[in-house]
Amino acid sequence: MELAEDWLVESLRLYQDFHAFDLSGATRVLEWIGEKGVFVAGYESLKKNEILHLILPLRLSVQENQGLHPERDFKVRHGGFSDRSVFDLKHVPDTRLLVTSGLPGCYIQMWQVREDNDVIEAVSTIDVQDKEESLWPRVSVFCSKAPGILHGARLSGLRTVDVESQKITYSSGTADSESLSCLQVLDANTFAFCGNSGRLGLVDTRQKWAALETVSPGSGCSGERWCAEVRNKGQGPGPCIASLGSDGQLCLLDSRNLCHPVSSAQCPVFKPSPDPELLRVTWAPGLDNCLAISGFDGTVQIYDVTSWDGKKTQAEPLFTHKGHIFLDGNDVDSAPLVTTHTWHPRKPRTLLSAASDSSLHVWDWVDLQAS
């Protein structure tokens, strides 16, 4: 309890802003729509799960230090129910459409956010090629005049389906059965993938399958399960791919040479991730060479990778969000597990994070080293 009390006092110095919200169920989904709205969705099995469109607190636009605000001041704009668990959700830009994936993974679901009422309704399903009991398809969205849904649980089952016609516009055509941990569309013709084993690849959909990829994690990068994210163009110089292992190994790679990491570091995690499905690494859209990781415990860790060199180093976080541990009086051993996090698209140091106890936090952290 003393640790929790100490953190509450320290939080006035650590955060420019902090809001807490209790969802009706835990979420693995935090998907932005604009700068003020976010989608969340439940992932419990054998029950209906809510899909909600939340509007963030208006006071986030206030600049002065406001301290803690553990109150229910998020607003529900739209809502709906899914008959299955929702592990991933993507908004189709410039439309009112959503796509969700989860278990059972025999299809992905299309949804429409109604304009004339507050309902999110299911409108269609898209069959997937890999129909295995324990696998669910990863999804990403090609943004163009004719948007497409990229999906697949394995490399062999990767397909793109046109949103309007639901015709298949791309198929990987490979027999490679590597299971996927994440997919990320990069532009109108290319996407990146990360396999559970750590394989990374860049694919041009205009060409026959010939992915520029790593065969396995590079030298010095060991781990049982992996996830990755590619930094958007224009986010500063340096390595553009971050790959995170379930043992806390973090590798930075250049897209022109995926076989050899530019640098790697060991993050200070006390034990491997208890649920590698929840591993997440994200680049900060408004800060150069800054990223966040979660999925190991009740924290979100933020790193400045500017000083990392080619040697394996012991990384120290620039900031650690411990609100999911201490805000409700938990101790470290009984703390909930952070299920996901995301950066605000416009506010450089503002993040959202969710945890297995159904808590949802939005927080603007202070860079104490800079101050």
Swiss-Prot record:
Q: What is the purpose of this protein?
A: Component of a multiprotein complex required for the assembly of the RNA endonuclease module of the integrator complex. Associates with INTS9 and INTS11 in the cytoplasm, stabilizing the INTS9-INTS11 heterodimer and blocking the active site of INTS11. BRAT1 then joins the complex and plugs the active site of INTS11, leading to WDR73 release and nuclear import of INTS9 and INTS11.
Instruction: Identify this protein by name.
Output: Integrator complex assembly factor WDR73
The subunit structure is:
Interacts with INTS9 and INTS11; the interaction is direct. Part of the multiprotein complex composed of BRAT1, WDR73, as well as integrator complex subunits INTS9 and INTS11.
Renumbered ranges of WD repeats: 81-121, 273-313, 333-371
- Xref: PANTHER family: WD REPEAT-CONTAINING PROTEIN 73 (PTHR46947:SF1)
Its subcellular locations are: Cytoplasm; Cytoplasm, Cytoskeleton, Spindle; Cytoplasm, Cytoskeleton, Spindle pole; Cleavage furrow
> Where does the UniProt entry say this protein principally localizes?
cytoplasm
Q: Which family does it belong to?
A: Belongs to the WD repeat WDR73 family.
Identify the keywords attached in UniProt to this record, alphabetized: Cytoplasm, Cytoskeleton, Repeat, WD repeat
The record's Gene Ontology biological-process terms are: cytoplasmic microtubule organization; nucleus organization
Presence of keyword Metal-binding: no
Q: Name one GO molecular function term.
A: protein-macromolecule adaptor activity
Q: Where does the source fall among the domains of life? A: Eukaryota
Q: Name one GO cellular component term.
A: cytoplasm
